[in-house]
Amino acid sequence: MRVRGRAWKYGDNIDTDVIIPARYLNTSDPKELAKHVLEDLDPEFRSKMKPGDIIVAGENFGCGSSREHAPLAIKAAGVSCVIAKSFARIFYRNAINIGLPILEAPQAVDRIETGDELEVDFSSGEIRNLTKGEVYRANPFPDFIMEIIKAGGLVEWAKRRLKG
């Protein structure tokens, strides 16, 4: 599985209240949540990002409240994956559960800049910076996690397994 998109780079400790502000938590409609993703951090993100773009961030991405709305809003906005130095554990689990690919790649984060064109191969863990001509490595997903992501999340994966 590969994705390609432009990088949007942010710093450390981007918490779930910044990813999707609490004032929008009166809905769980992914399309509605997507309209407001990262709006307090970067008011232009939603209007300028294109489907397939990639969020790149520092340490502890997704810290704070353990709400599934945060990765859901990111995925519904059309972001193809998130690359960070590290993730809050509950965000990591919620992202996998809803089928949002995420990779921990500190070296990549140090080198990638906003606007760089990236290509990510999840099966190998390879991140290509097409703008700079550089290649970075992340640990690839284990097969069972890749299956969950390809299925669109844990619920869809479980439905497929139950059908046989």
Swiss-Prot record:
One Gene Ontology term from the biological process aspect of the record: L-leucine biosynthetic process
Domain of life where this protein originates: Archaea
Q: What quaternary structure, including any partners, is listed in this protein's UniProt entry?
A: Heterodimer of LeuC and LeuD.
Signal sequence bounds: none
Q: Which UniProt keywords apply?
A: Amino-acid biosynthesis, Branched-chain amino acid biosynthesis, Leucine biosynthesis, Lyase
Enzyme Commission number(s) of this protein: 4.2.1.33
Name the family the entry cites. Answer: Belongs to the LeuD family. LeuD type 2 subfamily.
- InterPro entries from the entry? Aconitase/3IPM_dehydase_swvl, AconitaseA/IPMdHydase_ssu_swvl, IPMI_Swivel, LeuD, LeuD/DmdB_bac, LeuD_type2/HacB/DmdB
Can you name this protein? Answer: 3-isopropylmalate dehydratase small subunit 1
| A Pfam family reported for this protein in Swiss-Prot or TrEMBL | Aconitase_C
Its source organism is Pyrococcus abyssi (strain GE5 / Orsay)
Record flagged with keyword Nucleus: no
The role this protein plays is: Catalyzes the isomerization between 2-isopropylmalate and 3-isopropylmalate, via the formation of 2-isopropylmaleate.
Instruction: Give the catalytic activity.
Output: (2R,3S)-3-isopropylmalate = (2S)-2-isopropylmalate
